[in-house]
Amino acid sequence: MSLDAIKRKISSVQTTAKITNAMKLVATAKLKRQRDRLAAIKEYCHDYYDVIGLLLSVVNDIEFLKIPNAKNRTLYITINSTMGLAGSYNYNVNKLVSKIINEDDITFTIGKKGHDFMRLSNRLHQVNTYLNLNDNDLTFDMSLQIAREALELYSNGEVNKICIIYTKFINAITFEVNNIDVLPFDKTVLTKDNLAETIELAKDNIIFQPNKVELVKKILPTYIATVLYGSLIESKISENASRRNAMDAATKNAKALAEDYKLIYNTLRQGKITREITEIVAGSDD
């Protein structure tokens, strides 16, 4: 390999390192922004789940939420990313999707990478696709729209269960793909031990208008949207953290490769100089 060829390789690798480092910085900024957003809604979500748990605890029978003669299949709302270069983020989501979703199940895919996987798998019934999952698209209104569409399928008996597959953010290097049941309600999840005293008071002292059953039906879209919105933000945090880690590793590898090429370049250049000096000395002796 010539010295000029090695110089071109060094330049190319250094350019790549600059690009991956810039992507790392962008992902870091987005990660912080999404973590701040999650912190802002976390208290609201926890209080909302407490209210739902309280309401369900005083509704003696929630069988009314189960649609008679509904088809025995599940609607899965899957959350992937729109952009790639996010390490194993999308792979892990798709791996769980392949494992638990049956051919008869219905899917709402959020994120282009999820849509591409469903299309290439050629075996899953995909009803709705939301290709864009950029920061500007991540709104509660979007979650509410998807929640209403999902609830319509549930109310019409097209599915008897609604689940969300998302990525839970644990720390900067650890993420966990989860599948959570949204409908039917799981009382054991929503009703916490620390609500026991409040629940006892509610049974006698809280008046529900128009009534408990109608109130549960009214809050269903907002409930699903709240769960989905939290899942979207947490997935977005995991995506950006995974992309930051991937770009950090890529930058380090590119810099290491550039150093290796520089070593090769210097070795070849030193050899060339030595040969030229030897030839000059040999010529002068003649």
UniProtKB/Swiss-Prot annotation:
SUPFAM superfamilies: ATP synthase (F1-ATPase), gamma subunit
Pfam family name, one: ATP-synt
One Gene Ontology cellular component annotation held by this UniProt entry: plasma membrane
Keywords recorded for this protein, A-Z: ATP synthesis, Cell membrane, CF(1), Hydrogen ion transport, Ion transport, Membrane, Transport
Biological process (GO), any one: proton motive force-driven plasma membrane ATP synthesis
GO MF terms held by the record: ATP binding; proton-transporting ATP synthase activity, rotational mechanism
Membrane-protein topology: Peripheral membrane protein
UniProt entry tagged with the keyword Repeat: no
Subcellular location: Cell membrane
Function: Produces ATP from ADP in the presence of a proton gradient across the membrane. The gamma chain is believed to be important in regulating ATPase activity and the flow of protons through the CF(0) complex.
Subunit structure, interactors included: F-type ATPases have 2 components, CF(1) - the catalytic core - and CF(0) - the membrane proton channel. CF(1) has five subunits: alpha(3), beta(3), gamma(1), delta(1), epsilon(1). CF(0) has three main subunits: a, b and c.
The name this protein goes by in its record: ATP synthase gamma chain
